[in-house]
UniProtKB/Swiss-Prot annotation:
Keywords: 3Fe-4S, 4Fe-4S, Electron transport, Iron, Iron-sulfur, Metal-binding, Repeat, Transport. The keyword Transport applies. It comes from Mycolicibacterium smegmatis. This is Ferredoxin. Binds 1 [4Fe-4S] cluster. It comes from the Bacteria.
């Protein structure tokens, strides 16, 4: 599956959402998350991300390895709704994401 890492925090371009054929990219308050059980590993999201925040789970850079766990934590509470469009934006970013200082452009 794919994981969205730190470059997405406070940016949320959402080009990946438009590209995803299975509606598995969910929106938190500060970043986007890919549902590991709903993702079909097509990779369509990765090249369209303008901030290069999306990685195959085995290719996440070491400095962002904690984002795989943050992604899992996001869905531990949300469960598997069967499509992001049914949910809309939620405020259940994991605490590790909530605690990050503001990101993105000044």
């Amino acid at each position: 599956t794919y994981v969205i890492a730190e470059p997405c925090v406070d940016v949320k371009d959402k080009a990946c959402i438009e590209e995803c054929p299975v509606d598995c990219i969910y929106e938190g308050a500060r970043m986007l998350y890919i549902h590991p059980d709903e993702c079909v590993d097509c990779g369509a999201c990765e090249p369209v991300c303008p901030v290069e925040a999306i990685y195959y789970e085995d290719d996440v850079p070491d400095q962002w390895s904690s984002y795989a766990q943050a992604n899992a934590d996001f869905f531990a509470e949300l469960g598997s709704p069967g499509g992001a469009s049914k949910v809309g934006q939620t405020d259940n970013d994991p605490q590790a994401i909530k605690d990050l200082p503001p990101q993105g452009e000044d």
